[in-house]
Amino acid sequence: MTAALDPQRTLRELKELRALTSDENGAQRVAFTPIWAKARDWLRQKLEELFLEIHRDEAGNVWATLAGESDQALVIGGHIDSVPNGGWLDGSLNLLAGLEILRRIKTQYSGKPPVSVRLVDWADEEGARFGMSLFGSSACSGHINLAETRGLQDKDGIALIDALAEHGIDFERLKDSGRELQNAEAYIELHIEQGPILLDLDLALGAVLGTFGVERHAITFRGQAAHSGSTPMNRRRDAFLAAAKMSPESYRIANHHGGVCTIGTCSTLPGIATSVVAECRITLDQRHLDPAALARMLEEARHSSDRFAEEGDVSVSWERLMRIEPIPFDSELLALCDEAIRETCGAVYCLPSGPLHDAAEVARAGIPTAMMFVQSLYGISHNKIEDTKEEHIEAAVIAFDKLAEKAMQLMVRPGRSTDAERNS
């Protein structure tokens, strides 16, 4: 750790932000709300102390740039927005660790590092208000679906387009933000794990292999409504019975392939206590880092649903709700992340990310990307009890700073090639 890096300052600033933007129920920095704007003003004041070039792009992402000897840029990303009643670290740790790294780099290199270093606060990573996650980063990557996004409204009926306008953002120009990635040569992101894997392994930090691919479907079983008292069990065409069999089957499929499956919603018709279920709709969310394994998981689930439908003399239909391809992160940056963690903590574990992150959108744009996870106490996030040990936060800032330095040195190394170039 260099003298200019102060992980305890990151801790103090995280607590300062918590006091400013949280209540007894947790963090309230929902994007495109007054508290979120207040948090951004607070962050901007911190950035202005470093005399950086600061601006907001067409999608509402805020960029702070320390110009270097080269225009090629190392980008450090995070998000200051939260879910309602959220935790104090999700997203904000990324930004404030990045802020501390900017301080160190500016001091060490007398204001002129070998490459430009940029910190970005992505707009609306959580999607808590309008239901669309990764808003700012997907606009910047060019993958945002404007047709689907145009009609989004919050629970009060306020249109996303109108909320954007209130914050000075023109919906029609969202994709113009893509110019921000033109000189990006590497992207790194620190994040709390939001799960229990590092906790169970008793490890402070982990290197992220990539983000899971997602197959999310609605599955509807249709049978026959009948009186619950007068219909014998062997004469029922019970849609719920067939749907219920999918629950243990989803666990079998997930365990067999090393992925995860979740049946998250279930609704029935006619939905009364005195009727056999005529229609049962469930949602199945399947995730895996390997696209072939994810495809096999989906195929097995389809075959199983057909079998259960036949056994119960009901029909079944599928509707795709979401498909996201698995996104592996850059192997060279992953090796540097592994190295930085070993130098800091002595041990490291490589794991995939189940949740989606802005890093995935940057990787989809073709920018070499790496992520580092820090252990989450209780394995819980998106909750006011979200927490991480202070010594682990400090270790994360130190290791993340090492990764930033290693990434900069990699960028100026002659003959460097990316995964995409090596595989072309």
Residue ranges of predicted features:
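N-terminal capping segment at the start of a domain
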Residues: T2-P34, T149, I380-S381
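His/Asp/Glu-rich mid-to-C-terminal helical/loop segments that flank catalytic regions of hydrolases
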Residues: L209, H227, T231-H256, H303, ...
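Zn-dependent metallopeptidase/amidohydrolase metal-coordination segment
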Residues: T10-R18, G77-G78, A278, V348-A399
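Midchain, well-structured core segments that form catalytic/ion-binding scaffolds
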Residues: E125, G131-A292
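A non-catalytic alpha/beta surface segment that caps or lines the substrate-entry region
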Residues: T21-A67
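A short beta-alpha structural unit
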Residues: Q28-F32, G264-I272, T283-D290, S315-L334, ...
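Active-site metal-coordination/substrate-binding segment of hydrolases
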Residues: R44-E48, E53, W63-G157, I161-A165, ...
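Alpha-helical metal-binding/catalytic segments enriched in His/Glu/Asp
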Residues: I76, G86-E126, E215-F221, H227-I253, ...
